[in-house]
From Swiss-Prot:
Keywords: Aminoacyl-tRNA synthetase, ATP-binding, Cytoplasm, Ligase, Metal-binding, Nucleotide-binding, Protein biosynthesis, Zinc. It comes from Saccharophagus degradans (strain 2-40 / ATCC 43961 / DSM 17024). It holds the Pfam family zf-FPG_IleRS. It catalyses: tRNA(Ile) + L-isoleucine + ATP = L-isoleucyl-tRNA(Ile) + AMP + diphosphate. One of its GO terms (molecular function) is zinc ion binding. ATP binds at residue 603. This is Isoleucine--tRNA ligase. InterPro entries: aa-tRNA-synth_I_CS (IPR001412), aa-tRNA-synth_Ia (IPR002300), Anticodon_Ile_BEm (IPR033708), Ile-tRNA-ligase (IPR002301), Ile-tRNA-ligase_type1 (IPR023585), Ile-tRNA_ligase (IPR050081), M/V/L/I-tRNA-synth_anticd-bd (IPR013155), Rossmann-like_a/b/a_fold (IPR014729). GO terms for cellular component: cytosol. CDD domains: Anticodon_Ia_Ile_BEm (cd07960), IleRS_core (cd00818). Zn(2+) binds at residues 895, 898, 915, 918.
């Protein structure tokens, strides 16, 4: 038997079937770095319209987790897609380098600043620690295939950035938005520092929930205010609190003037409660009912004096709108030191704070009974004292959502302290910020409502911290008047120049005399540092506006949805305070990573996915494909199983690319590419499908619907290409003459498609795209990352054998395949090429099918196809209206070369084992194809 293998155009390519991404990618990264790929891209886009995505800085502490990977991959995909669209889209990665966690980690090694190590040396240790963390994270981000200015990222601890952060503060002062206030702020007793709203997270905490009686000091005064009071026993106003430790600082009880209140009889005593809460209080006390003995409006008891439950003093009743009937008793324990609402209502009545608790959460020496006690450990002592005094009505344990420090994970307290604030009301800053929200494009669009509602309850922003490792608040305050120095703007600039040279130590080590001269004795140098959210929040000023290759405002900010209360807000507030405009045109948010069951990821549960492990096992491109395949507008499920499925999808994409490349053997686009009008009908259709898909893909990239790109790509590879077109052209590719028009037509189509395909996947599967690019035929200049979208030829509108025609043919092919498969399963035929197919067609179906003439058999991949008039009894019914299919085993010999069963096999004596078509393709001029 003759071996005809050498006469076939068998596929060949250097593009490997097995990806081996984990092994291959590091070498490609090295090559990218050696060839200065990022710089090549910048050079290629020089002078083009810019697209600026500003990187929200991750915190420089610990290894990157899957959430970091998602964020960086999304940014990289968008930037690469924008570059393909012709934009100059630089990417400057950044890191947030100051703050408490770094201090804590350094303290563990060298002790507290000012105790075992001086402040200058401590700050240097913090700087060294942060730099080491940055290097570790940077290595992983680069390994993900993220391109950017990794040699010159921005760090909030860079001297220049620190200096510009100080300048940003100076602008805010200059524009009249800064003030010093004595207000209750979230306070970490572990970190001994104030926290901004953005640094607070809510976790469940078990607290004592107690009902406490504040006895009415003058019963006659009470009766005169509310009218007659029936019943017997002492009258007490009852408060409910989950923070017993704040009772030593109690200075009042607040009620709502508009609410209805009652006096109820409870055993030997009478209690004052909001009428709407009587039932829930009775349930709490374990009684069936509490009989009402008087009713009145809250306004009636404004100013009424009550006895403090354990101190020999009286406190007044105040009126406050913050009092509701959501829970408790409708009477609210009021300690202006320890609650925002308490502070506001007390301020209205001229009641000042007591400052009973120090920065470490310890009661000061002047606090009766509790001096020296820690607020975390005093609840039981307070409850015992209340019991002793007969003032404890009820106690229970309550699990509730409670503010915690997002860094140390410890419960916070509210504590009134002197702090620096960016005022949200002064100069209408909040109003301007809310107005700016309307001019920003939020994706998804619910982001607008989310940030808007958060801004509604936005207090003045406390930007001061009592830390060692942070950008200093470089202000001088008059010792007597507490006013800022009149020349603050110039002084801030002077200090900024010094910080630019020597870092923030230039301020901490500064002798005020150097700047203030003789005035130095009258002024105090502020020793507080800035909230880290201020550092990152002003990067629109210190980075975007400061770097020559960037431009303000940025086109896009892209972070997790938690940043509506974090970086998006701090950036917007500072930008409005400095420039009077938003720092971004568009804000895109992604959801959180969760496990396959939708549960939050946690090391303790053991359901985390390590990006490092994924890259080492499956490769970065699989991780990148998972990110693109997932709808990131909601929570993003990830697990080993999900990633395994993604790896399968990746293989389909890779195999499709491999088919394209392996069938372009011997094809030189410079000499062999056919004009579109000379290509076969099926090939023109395939290119047109690619062009239509490209239009969809580009739209999806522009609207950030990456999961749609994945779905469309997958469908293109599996259905339109793998399930139809590529199957059909194999015969033509392998069996026709190497340089025949029929083969060059298919190769021209494959070339067009792979040129487009490699660009479609480049932003997502970057390593694979580069690998494809290097295996493509023809001379290449630059890389796939410096290229622009490929211009695909389109079919003429209304072409006879256009898209609708080939879609119909695809349905017919599916119907025929089903019938053949049924016969094969029954053992009646071996495969499609061993089958002779008869199509019983209605007139309209027959008309369409006969357009392809004898080439219909190549499309249906059968040895012979006969189209006959419709029959209601012959053949099997199909899903195609007007079509029945009959399949019979071919009686003809199988061609040893093309495997078709043809009647002319053996008729040529020189080639007794092959068909006439193959003889023509070997020895003659070659067969001619018109359609497929």
């Amino acid at each position: 038997m003759t071996d005809y293998k050498a006469t076939l155009n068998l596929p060949q390519t250097s593009f490997a079937m097995k990806a081996n991404l984990a092994q291959r990618e590091p070498g490609m990264l090295k090559q990218w770095q050696q060839s200065k790929l990022y710089e090549q891209i910048r050079e290629a886009r020089k002078g083009r319209e810019q697209f600026i995505l500003h990187d929200g800085p991750p915190y420089a502490n610990g290894d990157i987790h899957i959430g970091h990977a998602v964020n960086k991959i999304l940014k990289d995909i968008i930037i690469k897609a924008k570059t393909l669209s012709g934009f100059d889209a630089p990417y400057v990665p950044g890191w947030d380098c100051h703050g408490l966690p770094i201090e804590h980690n350094v303290e563990k090694k060298v002790g507290k600043a000012g105790v075992k190590i001086d402040h200058v040396a401590f700050r240097q240790k913090c700087r060294d620690y942060a730099r080491k963390q940055v290097e570790g994270q940077k290595k992983d981000f680069i390994r993900l295939g993220v391109l950017g200015e990794w040699d010159t990222p921005y760090l909030t601890m860079d001297f220049k950035t620190e200096a510009d952060t100080v300048r940003a503060l100076g602008k805010i002062v200059e524009n009249g938005h800064l003030h010093k206030g004595f207000k209750p702020v979230y306070w970490s007793v572990v970190g001994a520092s104030a926290l901004a709203e953005a640094e607070v997270e809510y976790q469940d905490k078990t607290s004592f929930a107690i009902d406490v009686c504040f006895g009415v000091a003058d019963v006659e005064d009470f009766a005169a205010r509310v009218g007659s009071v029936a019943g017997t026993g002492n009258i007490s106003v009852v408060i409910w609190t989950t923070t017993p430790w704040t009772l030593p600082a109690n200075q009042a009880v607040s009620v709502n003037g508009e609410l209805d209140y009652v006096v109820v009889q409870h055993g030997e005593q009478r209690l004052v409660l909001a009428e709407a809460l009587v039932e829930s209080v009775a349930k709490r006390l374990g009684v069936e009912e509490l009989a009402t003995v008087a009713t009145f409006k809250g306004a009636a008891i404004e100013g009424l004096k009550l006895n403090h439950p354990f101190y020999a003093k009286q406190v007044p009743v105040l009126l406050g709108d913050h009092v509701t009937t959501d829970a408790g008793t409708g009477c609210v324990h009021t300690a202006p030191d320890h609650g925002a609402d308490d502070f506001v209502v007390s301020n209205k009545y001229g009641i000042e704070t007591l400052n009973y608790v120090d920065e470490n959460g310890i009661y000061r020496d002047n606090v009766e009974i509790f001096a020296g006690d820690h607020v975390y450990k005093v609840d039981e002592k307070v409850i015992g004292l209340l019991e002793e005094n007969g003032r404890l009505l009820h106690q229970a344990k309550l699990v509730h959502s409670f503010p915690h420090c997002w860094r140390t994970k410890t419960p916070l307290i509210f504590r009134a302290t002197p702090q620096w604030f960016v005022s949200m009301t002064k100069n209408n800053l909040l109003k301007d910020v809310k107005q700016a929200v309307e001019g920003v494009n939020w994706v998804p669009d619910w982001g607008r409502a989310r940030i808007d509602s958060m801004l509604d309850s936005s207090p003045d922003w406390c930007i001061s911290r009592q830390r060692t490792w942070g950008v200093p608040i470089t202000l001088f305050v008059h010792k007597e008047t507490q006013e800022l120095h009149p020349n603050t703007a110039a002084l801030v600039e002077d200090v900024a120049k010094r910080i630019e040279e020597k870092g923030m130590d230039a301020w901490f080590e500064l002798d005020a005399v150097e700047l203030l001269g003789d005035e130095a004795d009258q002024y105090q140098k502020v020793t507080d540092t800035l909230d880290v959210w201020f550092d990152s929040g002003v990067t629109h000023y210190s980075v975007v506006n400061a770097r020559e290759n960037l431009r303000y405002p940025a086109d896009l900010y892209l972070e997790g949805s938690d940043q509506h209360r974090g970086w998006f807000q701090s950036s917007l507030k500072t930008s409005m305070a400095i420039n009077g405009s938003a720092p971004y045109k568009q804000v895109l948010t992604h959801g959180f990573t969760v496990d396959a069951d939708g549960k939050k990821m946690s090391k303790s549960i053991g359901n985390t996915v390590s990006p490092q492990k994924v890259m080492n096992d499956l490769g970065a491109d699989v991780l990148r494909l998972w990110v693109a395949a997932t709808d990131f507008s909601g929570d993003m499920s990830v697990s080993d199983e999900i990633l395994k499925r993604t790896a399968d999808s990746y293989r389909r994409i890779r195999n499709t690319a491999r088919f394209f490349l392996s069938n372009l053997t011997g094809f030189n686009p410079q000499t062999d590419l056919l004009p579109a009008e000379e290509m076969l009908s099926l090939d023109r259709w395939a290119v047109d499908r690619a062009a239509a898909l490209q239009a969809d893909i580009l739209k999806s990239y522009d609207t950030y619907q990456l999961h749609q790109i994945y779905q469309k790509l997958h469908n293109f590879c599996v259905v339109e290409m793998g399930g139809f077109y590529l199957d059909i052209i194999k015969d033509r590719q392998y069996t026709t003459k190497e340089t025949s028009h029929a083969r060059r037509s298919a190769q021209s189509a494959l070339y067009h498609i792979v040129e487009a395909f490699v660009r479609w996947i480049a932003p997502i599967c970057s390593f694979t795209a580069d690998e494809i690019w290097q295996a493509m035929p023809g001379e290449k200049t630059g890389t796939v990352f410096t290229a622009e979208w490929y211009n695909l030829p389109r079919l003429a509108e209304g072409a006879e054998l256009g898209n609708s025609y080939w879609q119909f043919i695809a349905k017919v092919k599916t119907a025929v395949n089903k019938t053949i498969e049924a016969k094969r399963s029954a053992g009646e035929v071996g495969g499609s090429l061993a089958a002779e197919v008869t199509l019983y067609c209605s007139e309209s179906v027959a008309q369409k099918l006969t357009l392809l003439k004898d080439e219909l058999r190549f499309v249906l991949i059968c040895s012979s196809v006969t189209v006959v008039a419709a029959s209601e009894t012959e053949g099997e019914a199909t899903e195609v209206e007007g079509l029945r299919v009959a399949v019979a085993k071919s009686s003809h010999e199988k061609c040893a070369r093309c495997w078709h069963h043809r009647e002319d096999v053996g008729q040529n004596t020189a080639h007794p084992e092959i068909c006439g078509r193959c003889v023509e393709n070997i020895d003659g001029e070659g067969e001619s194809r018109e359609f497929a």
